[in-house]
């Protein structure tokens, strides 16, 4: 089921046995989403936004009850859903779990999964994370190793790898906080360096005066 921001059913996604995905004909999809387990987003401490339902479901299985997992269904819808979530749940901490579309990048030169995930993260003022697979997995089969569900189902890292990567991302400092800390650290370092530099200048001035007197 696909819901809009008001919780109204707007469409259905059908997944065939071969993995083909279809939406109900002439249905609304833009800015609509699916919340795994129909969790109350207003009570969630962290909201994780991802593309497909399978990815969102795998992420939910790997996290606790303070985390809500939301599927946008496709990369193009990520920024649209991000705008809805940002406006409606400003109290939440957000994380975007993006797809790494290397197969598309190899053919077309662009990576829509990454690009749209980063765009959504900018809207939500949060970080975007992408699955890290075991060495050689992604390079040998681009299509088979794309999202966090692939990490759980197909990678040597498996569900434990998914849980580790997602939970580490949840508990990492937000990107904006890291930038604040970095700026603060540089400012403190600069303020500490100033007295030292002033002392050096004073010493050089004293040395010049002494040398000048001696020459007289």
Regions of interest found by a model, annotated:
Residues 1-90:
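Phosphate-handling DNA/RNA-contact segment within nucleic-acid enzymes
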Residues 44-45, 57-216:
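TOPRIM fold recognition
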């Amino acid at each position: 089921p696909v819901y809009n921001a008001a919780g109204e059913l707007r469409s259905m996604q059908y997944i065939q046995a071969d993995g083909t995905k279809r939406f109900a004909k002439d249905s609304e999809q833009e800015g609509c989403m699916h919340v795994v387990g129909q969790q109350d987003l207003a009570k969630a401490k962290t909201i994780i936004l991802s593309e497909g339902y399978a990815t969102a479901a795998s992420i939910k299985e790997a996290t606790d009850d303070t985390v809500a997992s939301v599927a946008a269904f496709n990369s193009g819808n990520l920024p649209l859903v991000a705008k809805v979530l940002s406006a409606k749940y400003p109290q939440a901490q957000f994380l975007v779990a993006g797809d790494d579309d290397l197969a598309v990048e190899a053919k077309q030169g662009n990576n829509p999964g990454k690009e749209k995930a980063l765009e959504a993260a900018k809207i939500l003022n949060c970080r975007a994370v992408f699955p890290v697979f075991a060495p050689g997995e992604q390079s040998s089969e681009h299509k088979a190793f794309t999202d966090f569900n692939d990490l759980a189902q197909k990678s040597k890292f498996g569900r434990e790898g998914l849980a580790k990567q997602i939970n580490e991302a949840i508990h990492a400092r937000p990107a904006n906080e890291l930038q604040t800390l970095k700026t603060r650290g540089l400012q403190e370092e600069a303020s500490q360096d100033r007295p030292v530099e002033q002392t050096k200048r004073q010493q050089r001035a004293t040395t010049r005066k002494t040398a000048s007197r001696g020459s007289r």
